[in-house]
């Protein structure tokens, strides 16, 4: 196990990068990532954020989740901003994102950038609000821009 924060970050980068490559080789990276994210997020919410209560407003829920993630030491809340309403959230994620290294590597290799933060936020909204949200990375850069939009359940 890594003994430094930098070592842990490198381990996370390699894990996420490998997971994305495996997902792409299976043919449907978004579906695979959603399954992995949901499983991990449910456990994370139970263990690391047992008192987290999301507002019914998607924007407020994203802000609260980000602050709770900051308090748990997982990521920095000061590098993320959100605006929107109950059904649509626009966010900006800065340089302190723990997944930036993986996204940058994939971008530089000409591979699709799958925003793990957007995945996590859309899954958190689905779990906590029992509502389906589509995510989109509208711009990779400094900062990254994401959009989450409430959709109807598919039956």
Protein language model regions, located:
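N-terminal accessory segment detector
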Residues: 1-114, 131-145, 151-155
